[in-house]
Amino acid sequence: MSHSACPKPATARHSQALTGEIRIPGDKSISHRSFMFGGLASGKTRITGLLEGEDVINTGRAMQAMGARIRKEGDVWIINGVGNGCLLQPEAPLDFGNAGTGARLTMGLVGTYDMKTSFIGDASLSKRPMGRVLNPLREMGVQVEAAEGDRMPLTLIGPRTANPIAYRVPMASAQVKSAVLLAGLNTPGVTTVIEPVMTRDHTEKMLQGFGADLTVETDKDGVRHIRIVGQGKLTGQTIDVPGDPSSTAFPLVAALLVEGSEVTIRNVLMNPTRTGLILTLQEMGADIEIIDPRLAGGEDVADLRVKASKLKGVVVPPERAPSMIDEYPVLAIAASFAEGETVMDGLDELRVKESDRLAAVARGLEANGVDCTEGEMSLTVRGRPGGKGLGGGTVATHLDHRIAMSFLVMGLASEKPVTVDDSTMIATSFPEFMGMMAGLGAKIAESGAE
């Protein structure tokens, strides 16, 4: 899908207090994996709360193309899986649209099959580096035909029998870790991933839930050793997907910034590898109350009550980056309204997201009167409490859903309106965003609609 065909600009204006109660769509990471593991497992998997954004649906289509049967009955997705080791060679290239997670995880899943699988994506995904996933697959015996710089379109030609490897992940990347573990599912023997910096652990938790022989040990230096025994049986499960913390970030920050707001957000995933933003905002003085913390499907879930707050600038520890990598754009918005300076460092991963997210955020802040400094791996924001003088700019989103939503949040609290050049790609991760924000009282209008 090309989002650039017909861009739809949107403008956010200074809003009165945001109030109400919302339930956030399902977590994107868990939704991708639910379709993948359900499609791979033997028997039936039932999923409620699935995020029905384009990215996740593309992962579902890929699993269908390899033999899984997927249908929706009411609010429940029902999957009849093929059984581990039994995926079929797809007849056409698998099209992942804008979905980096879906593409990279599926490369791991299918790479070790003795078959030929081609991957394509939209203009944004075709610019993103895939080598980080392809290199360990090459070590396992997979042949790769790729565009320059290990980019898509690309084709994987699997070995007759894959070699199990022990792979030390060179950067903090849950996608690389997951791709290697999934490749290990169809590989004889034990595949090991060595992870020096812990990243989101949904793959490990969910594979264990589906019955994989997977163990995790942390050594005395805090390095995780994750071992999976290949060619075991996976069995279908019932999954209720908790609300996505990365999507939660947008209404949450909006409620903190718009004067007089009080918003309750239900059913939010509180996995400790994903809560860096909430922790950082609390350090800045945010009034975020965590209500009814509970376990659902092996994951921590809670409700959040958020009240408008006066924020202070902080230095965010760089080691926190993996637990909030997708939330830095909206944290930069919060920092724009905080008293003093906020320093964010260790942001090199942001350079290879849907856009060069670090540059996109810095340019957007500058266009709206925010005093900020972009370093090679850092961003420093000097805030203006109350948003006085902020806004009035148009932000280039570069087909990036999180840039679009972050700057629309900014416009709700800034003195002057903020416009984003395109809002169509918000549908990749949070199709309900516009309606949900309007329901809380946010003034956001798409061009041509008032």
UniProtKB/Swiss-Prot annotation:
Matches recorded under InterPro entries: Enolpyruvate_Tfrase_dom, Enolpyruvate_Tfrase_sf, EPSP_synthase, EPSP_synthase_CS, RNA3'P_cycl/enolpyr_Trfase_a/b
CC annotations in GO: cytoplasm
Pathway: Metabolic intermediate biosynthesis; chorismate biosynthesis; chorismate from D-erythrose 4-phosphate and phosphoenolpyruvate: step 6/7
Organism: Brucella abortus (strain 2308)
Subcellular location(s) per record: Cytoplasm
Active site per UniProt: 326 (proton acceptor)
Function noted in UniProt: Catalyzes the transfer of the enolpyruvyl moiety of phosphoenolpyruvate (PEP) to the 5-hydroxyl of shikimate-3-phosphate (S3P) to produce enolpyruvyl shikimate-3-phosphate and inorganic phosphate.
Oligomer and partners: Monomer.
Keyword Amino-acid biosynthesis found: yes
Binding locations of 3-phosphoshikimate: 28-29, 33, 173, 175, 326, 353
Catalytic activity field: 3-phosphoshikimate + phosphoenolpyruvate = 5-O-(1-carboxyvinyl)-3-phosphoshikimate + phosphate
GO MF term list: 3-phosphoshikimate 1-carboxyvinyltransferase activity
Family note: Belongs to the EPSP synthase family.
HAMAP family named among the record's database cross-references: EPSP_synth
Keyword entries, A-Z: Amino-acid biosynthesis, Aromatic amino acid biosynthesis, Cytoplasm, Transferase
Protein name as it appears in the record: 3-phosphoshikimate 1-carboxyvinyltransferase
Gene encoding the protein: aroA
Residues noted as binding phosphoenolpyruvate in the record, renumbered to the chain: 28, 100, 128, 175, 357, 402
GO BP annotations listed: amino acid biosynthetic process; aromatic amino acid family biosynthetic process; chorismate biosynthetic process
